[in-house]
Swiss-Prot record:
Pfam families for the chain: Hist_deacetyl
Function recorded in the entry: Histone deacetylase that catalyzes the deacetylation of lysine residues on the N-terminal part of the core histones (H2A, H2B, H3 and H4), and some other non-histone substrates. Histone deacetylation gives a tag for epigenetic repression and plays an important role in transcriptional regulation, cell cycle progression and developmental events. Histone deacetylases act via the formation of large multiprotein complexes, such as N-Cor repressor complex, which activate the histone deacetylase activity.
Active site: 135
UniProt subcellular location: Nucleus; Chromosome; Cytoplasm; Cytoplasm, Cytosol
Gene Ontology cellular component list: chromatin; cytoplasm; cytosol; Golgi apparatus; histone deacetylase complex; mitotic spindle; nucleoplasm; nucleus
Binding site for Zn(2+): 170, 172, 259
GO MF terms held by the record: chromatin binding; chromatin DNA binding; cyclin binding; DNA-binding transcription factor binding; enzyme binding; GTPase binding; histone deacetylase activity; histone deacetylase activity, hydrolytic mechanism
Residues annotated with Phosphoserine modification: 424
Keywords: Biological rhythms, Chromatin regulator, Chromosome, Cytoplasm, Host-virus interaction, Hydrolase, Nucleus, Phosphoprotein, Repressor, Transcription, Transcription regulation, Ubl conjugation
Region Histone deacetylase: start-end pairs: 3-316
Subunit: Interacts with HDAC7 and HDAC9. Interacts with DAXX, KDM4A, HDAC10 and DACH1. Found in a complex with NCOR1 and NCOR2. Component of the N-Cor repressor complex, at least composed of NCOR1, NCOR2, HDAC3, TBL1X, TBL1R, CORO2A and GPS2. Interacts with BCOR, MJD2A/JHDM3A, NRIP1, PRDM6 and SRY. Interacts with BTBD14B. Interacts with GLIS2. Interacts (via the DNA-binding domain) with NR2C1; the interaction recruits phosphorylated NR2C1 to PML bodies for sumoylation. Component of the Notch corepressor complex. Interacts with CBFA2T3 and NKAP. (Microbial infection) Interacts with human cytomegalovirus (HHV-5) immediate early protein IE1; this interaction decreases histone acetylation and allows transcriptional activation by the virus.
Protein name: Histone deacetylase 3
Gene assigned in the entry: HDAC3
UniProt keyword Kinase present: no
Length: 428
């Protein structure tokens, strides 16, 4: 039975620019949306221009001092915030750029609205590719992430759902989400990520399992360089199957960071777009309300391919291997296909013995769980936002270019000869 899918896209979210040379390029969201439009996938979804999160919304998780700082700081006045910049870890990896707070408001609002719609059973699946910024902490920015939209969305889901499962397939450990829910059994966090050799953020060991009420409700799958589709699937599907069976979540949040693909600018895995998509399709197969978010991904053309393909899986619509012509067509050269070969020469250092050892340890930890922990009956607080369908347009009446513009910032894709988004560095 086909699911009702809500899709959140703000036409301005791709306008923001972290700065020349920075690997995080919000313009990847415009590429993704363009492919979603030109493949006609928008016809299979309810499309929303999302709510913008307020300071109050963000302070559900973050400290007021930190959010107040994000709202006030700008490139023109940052010299007066030297102490705060250091205190809140804003600087090189997490730069101050024009419209910083507005950017955070837009991607966070979309995740929050997706959670609210799932709570109200308006949709079965909610998609926000702009979200998934999993490194942000309560008091500070981290790893290109300022506001943790995932945590804020989960807090909203917890009003209606006794148990929320968080799954993270970004190459980097979902440390901000893990830290937020480390002491509770209301949220179970499962992260598959590269671990070791000082790889960012340096957390996510298999023996980080939670504490107090949350002991054993935190599950980490530390992986080595070069993992491929077969090895990843060998671990992902049995682990997630066991987690769902033991924990019985009533809602799932899936972070789909695309930096776990082969040929990613900051990555070291060997997943194909199909292999990455298999994880999304498998999670969808449990027929549990699902919030799907973006995350990392730094070879922008492949991020767009990946998230477009995964959108097609979520709406159960087959799409052609040949990319449709669009204003961004030239960025998908030389093949102009949906599934280019993104394998690299990185050796798969994840032996079958190593993966079996991880799986055995994880299964032993899962045996320590209480099956489906319960919560006491409580009054449900008011929704953080009031649902309003005024931004919804009928798919058949809405033109594919509605609410869409082509923003372009200097260096939005390539920052000179040393930017390894260029074709000369990576064979795609």
């Amino acid at each position: 039975m086909a699911k009702t899918v809500a899709y959140f896209y703000d036409p301005d979210v791709g306008n923001f620019h972290y700065g020349a040379g920075h690997p995080m390029k919000p313009h990847r969201l415009a590429l993704t949306h363009s492919l979603v439009l030109h493949y006609g996938l928008y016809k299979k979804m309810i499309v929303f221009k999302p709510y913008q999160a307020s300071q109050h919304d963000m302070c559900r998780f973050h400290s007021e001092d930190y959010i107040d700082f994000l709202q006030r700081v700008s490139p023109t006045n940052m010299q007066g915030f030297t102490k705060s910049l250091n205190a809140f870890n804003v600087g090189d990896d997490c730069p101050v750029f024009p419209g910083l707070f507005e950017f955070c408001s837009r991607y966070t609002g979309a995740s929050l609205q997706g959670a609210t719609q799932l709570n109200n059973k308006i949709c079965d699946i909610a998609i926000n590719w702009a979200g998934g910024l999993h490194h942000a902490k309560k008091f500070e920015a981290s790893g290109f992430c300022y506001v943790n939209d995932i945590v804020i969305g989960i807090l909203e889901l917890l009003k209606y759902h006794p148990r929320v499962l968080y799954i993270d397939i970004d190459i980097h450990h979902g440390d901000g989400v893990q830290e937020a829910f480390y002491l509770t059994d209301r949220v179970m966090t499962v992260s598959f990520h590269k671990y070791g050799n000082y790889f960012f953020p340096g957390t996510g060991d298999m023996y980080e399992v939670g504490a107090e009420s949350g002991r054993y409700y935190c599950l980490n799958v530390p992986l080595r360089d070069g993992i491929d589709d077969q090895s990843y699937k060998h671990l992902f599907q049995p682990v997630i199957n066991q987690v769902v069976d033991f924990y019985q979540p009533t809602c799932i949040v899936l972070q789909c960071g695309a930096d776990s693909l082969g040929c990613d600018r900051l990555g070291c895995f060997n997943l194909s777009i199909r292999g990455h998509g298999e994880c999304v399709e498998y999670v969808k197969s449990f027929n549990i309300p699902l919030l799907v978010l973006g995350g990392g991904g730094y070879t922008v053309r492949n991020v767009a391919r990946c998230w477009t393909y995964e959108t097609s899986l979520l709406v159960e619509e087959a799409i052609s291997e040949e990319l449709p012509y669009s204003e961004y067509f030239e960025y998908f050269a030389p093949d102009f296909t949906l599934h280019p070969d993104v394998s690299t020469r990185i050796e798969n250092q994840n032996s079958r013995q190593y993966l079996d050892q991880i799986r055995q340890t994880i299964f032993e930890n899962l045996k320590m769980l209480n099956h489906a922990p319960s919560v006491q009956i409580h009054d449900v607080p008011a929704d953080l936002l009031t649902y309003d369908r005024t931004d919804e347009a009928d798919a058949e009446e809405r033109g594919p270019e509605e609410n869409y513009s082509r923003p372009e910032a200097p260096n939005e894709f390539y920052d000179g000869d040393h930017d390894n988004d260029k074709e000369s560095d990576v064979e795609i």
